[in-house]
Structures are given as C-alpha cells and as structure tokens.
C-alpha cells in the first residue's frame, strides 16, 4: 500500500461508502499545489470540501487542531497509525505528502467552520454529558474535558471532539480498546474501563456539541 499510486489510492477512496467523485487533476507529489486545491480535489472525496464529511465512516476535520491533524498525517505517512482506515486509505495518500504539504492541509482544515448537529436522545445526552464533564468516578475514569477542553475543542495534542460523528467516535474508541492500531495514547487504558453503552453515550453527546449546551 505504501507504494500505491495516486490514481490507485483515489480509486480505492471512490469505491468506499460515503465518498463522492472529485476532479483528479492534481498530483500529490507536486509540492507547488496549494493546500486548498489538494483539500478540494483529493481530501474532499471523503472528508468534504470544508472538512464536514457526510459519512460517519470518515471523520470531520473542520475546526480540528492543526497540530493534531499534522501529527496524524505524519503517523499515516510513517505507517505508525495502522487502524483499518489508516492502511486502507490514508497510507497511500499520505505517502506522497511533504512536511510543508501536511502543515498546509492541517492549517486549511483547522480554519474551516464545523457544522452544528441536532441533539440525540435526551437520556443518552444526559449520560454522555456526565461522563464528559465528570468522568466515571467508580472506575477512576477522568472527565473527557480534562484533556479535550470544556467545549470539547481540543487542547494541544488532544483532538477536537465537538461535532464529530457519533459512529466514528465509537469506532475509534473500540480501536483504542481492542487493537494496537493507534499506539502511544492514554486512551487505551481509559477505553478498557468503559462499557459499550458509556461509549455510545459520550460519543452521542459529543456529536451534538455545541447544541448540547
């Protein structure tokens, strides 16, 4: 996969659920292509032109911390992040990116405006809010906001979670819990303490941010 051509990588992407066809006239190996053009003609295929993806199979990138995005792209490029979407889609794409291109793409998506989502089930929202703000004390699980910020906006190397797809968040929590696909994170220990119901609740609450307030 690491040596996959741009066209092959994009062919894989266009066959995946939730991806729409885009113009494929740019070569990722060309460092002179502006980040906005790469985002529009390549990344938008799954993540949306403005980073607000439609399909929960692909994360929303709008408003994400640029440092976090850059780190994830670097991890894809070096194959350190090996969860299934990583090696199926992002390894081939990120292999073509230079450091400057990664920085430019991260800054582009960080400047996009995240969509606001409607709240989910009221009981789920209440349970998710409790975990986000207070943690799960009897399991010694810290509040999510301790690392991700009181508005789930992300802090430093910790990602923005506000407005992210519920299904995507749940899948990532299971990746942390069940695999070694995302090493070097405190989330692995935390997710081992959470039930499936607790994961669903906090992910549903985060998807509705900031309308949950």
Give the location of each predicted region.
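Sequence context surrounding c-type heme c attachment/ligation sites in exported
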Residues: 33-44, 62, 70-71, 133-145, ...
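Electrostatic cytochrome c docking/interface patches
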Residues: 19-40, 52-57, 111-137, 211-213
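Axial heme c-ligation environment in periplasmic c-type cytochrome domains
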Residues: 54-60, 76-120, 155-160, 179-209
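N-terminal export/targeting leaders of redox proteins
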Residues: 1-31, 74, 208-213
């Amino acid at each position: 996969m690491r040596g996959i051509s741009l066209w092959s990588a994009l062919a894989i992407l266009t066959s995946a659920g939730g991806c729409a066809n885009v113009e494929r006239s740019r070569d990722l190996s060309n460092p002179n292509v502006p980040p906005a053009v790469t985002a529009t003609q390549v990344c938008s295929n799954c993540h949306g032109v403005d980073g607000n993806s439609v399909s929960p199979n692909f994360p929303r990138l709008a408003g994400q911390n640029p440092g976090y995005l850059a780190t994830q792209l670097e991890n894809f490029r070096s194959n350190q992040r090996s969860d299934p979407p990583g090696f199926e889609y992002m390894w081939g794409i990120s292999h073509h990116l230079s450091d400057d291109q990664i920085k430019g793409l991260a800054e582009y998506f960080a400047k996009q405006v995240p969509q606001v989502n409607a709240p989910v089930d009221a009981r789920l929202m209440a349970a998710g809010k409790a975990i986000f703000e207070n943690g799960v004390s009897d399991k010694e699980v810290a509040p999510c906001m301790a690392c991700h910020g009181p508005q789930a906006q992300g802090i430093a190397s910790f990602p923005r979670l506000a407005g992210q797809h519920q299904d995507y968040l749940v899948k990532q929590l299971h990746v942390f819990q069940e695999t070694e696909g995302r090493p070097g994170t405190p989330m692995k220990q935390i997710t081992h303490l959470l039930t499936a119901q607790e994961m669903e609740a906090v992910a549903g609450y985060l998807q509705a941010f900031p309308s949950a307030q």
